[in-house]
Structure formats: structure tokens, C-alpha cells
């Protein structure tokens, strides 16, 4: 289960578009599951940080990721509910998952000039609470 402000969610491809309504849920493992990837346009707060949290109430665990939206303007969610290969990727990034050539081609590639420096702020908060029992 995700805890996040309302924001735009953009599917990477037709497979993700078919699963858009369930972007915020992790499905049961399936042998025929095909990975889905979503781009999130998360709003930054007054401090320039954007964030998202994912939690499992049954286990009482929660992860919150906050990042500097100015230097990491993209947030990518990779969802794979394949039996035997179950995984979730939560990735603040300054690039897309389409590759460098695609980013250069569409004008979104970022470059660091000679002598330039860039700061990336990332905060990971891991919390454990008492599990919620049905």
C-alpha cells in the first residue's frame, strides 16, 4: 500500500497502461505476470523535497523515500509480481528508464558541465510498527 499525495502517474507502455488502475497495489504472484513501470510526477514541498511511502500493515513495516526534486526530477516505480521473481523498484532518478539514447533524442538528458557539481539529497526512513491483525 502506498502513502502519497495526489499526483500524475504515467504508464511506460501498453502493459503498464493496462495495469494503471492498480499501480498502488502489489498483486499476488502470478506465473504469467509481465512487469509494469510507472513514472510519477510527485509534488515537491517548500523545502524542494518530494516523497512517497510504501507500507505493509500486516507486517507493520513502512519505507518512506524523500528526494531533491530539482536534481532528481523523475520517480520511477518498477513492479514485477512474477512468481519466483517478485520485486518492487522505487527509483528517484534524473533519467528515464528508456536509456541514454532515448533521453538525448527527446531532449531530457541532463549533463554535468566540466567543473560543475550537483548535490542529490536522498532520505530513507524505515519504520516498524505493531502489525495490524485482521
Q: Whereabouts are the PLM-identified features?
A:
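Active-site/ligand-binding surface loops and adjacent short beta/alpha elements
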Residues: 1-69
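Active-site pocket scaffolds in enzymes
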Residues: 58-134
Amino acid at each position: 500500500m502506498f502513502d502519497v499525495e495526489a499526483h500524475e502517474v504515467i504508464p511506460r507502455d501498453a502493459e503498464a497502461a493496462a495495469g494503471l488502475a492498480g499501480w498502488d497495489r502489489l498483486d499476488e504472484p502470478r506465473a504469467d505476470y509481465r512487469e509494469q513501470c510507472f513514472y510519477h510526477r510527485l509534488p515537491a514541498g517548500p523545502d524542494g523535497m518530494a516523497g512517497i511511502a510504501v507500507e505493509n500493515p500486516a507486517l507493520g513495516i513502512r519505507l518512506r523515500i524523500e528526494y531533491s526534486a530539482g536534481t532528481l526530477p523523475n520517480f520511477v516505480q518498477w513492479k514485477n509480481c512474477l512468481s519466483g521473481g517478485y520485486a518492487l523498484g522505487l527509483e528517484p532518478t534524473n533519467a528515464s528508464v528508456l536509456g541514454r539514447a532515448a533521453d538525448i533524442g527527446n531532449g531530457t538528458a541532463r549533463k554535468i558541465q566540466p567543473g560543475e557539481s550537483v548535490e542529490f539529497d536522498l532520505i530513507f526512513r524505515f519504520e516498524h510498527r505493531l502489525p495490524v491483525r485482521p
